[in-house]
Amino acid sequence: MGIKKNSENEKIRKSVDEFYRKISQDEYRTEVSPEEVSTSLGYSTEMMEQLPKGTDLGLSCGNPLENFELKNRETLIDLGCGTGKDLFLTRIKYPDSGTLYGLDRLDEMILKAEKIRDMKKFKNIEFRQGTLTSMPFEPESMDKAISNCVINLEPEKQTVYNELYRILKNGGKFYISDIMLKKELPKEWKKSEKMHNTWVGGALLEEELKKVIKKAGFKNIIIIKDEVTDAYAEKWGYGLKIKEYIQRGMIMGEK
């Protein structure tokens, strides 16, 4: 059973990697632009105009920047940072905070993020290639963590939250935007690689997600629910009625 499960998880990860590699290389496009998705989620045009074209890939389902503040010298990690959009916007908003770290599975994403960082001369932003299930960071090294529509891509969510607990300092907080289920998905959706690639296939019900987070050791868990935007559903829904089954959540907790 364990071997079969691991095999299925690796199949999902491989499919996800291939899908996002295509996106990073601009080989996957839809009629809805990345900018339309971001604007629908509360990213202002003024904010996005401060970043080079191509930084925004339209991979967000929320806006964690609306929910946290960074004090001077506080460190922050973005789990599944992609090309670094949320980190760059955080640096613009908090120029005197500590080092910002981005973690992503794909070298292609890291290379693009580093290129943008160097082009815009952003200071104290470091990117590392690695997985959410084995984060290449020391214990209790981060004050805050964010993530934007990424953790649902990883089959072993308990391991992710365990790792997040490990790297956060005591009193550290996380702010995670992700997709949650309103009700159980159709079986064919759960088995669909493309639904896993776009956060739906791996989504959990709210109570299931809370159990995972509590088991990792977190406290003061708050989940703010909202409908997914029409732009998001149109871009990533494959023409299916995904809004009947999913919602977006702003998930917050403290170590």
Q: What is each PLM-predicted segment?
A:
Residues 133-144:
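A short acidic, Gly/Pro-enriched loop at the edge of an enzyme's catalytic core
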Residues 180-200:
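Short, glycine-/aromatic-enriched active-site segment of Class I SAM-dependent methyltransferases
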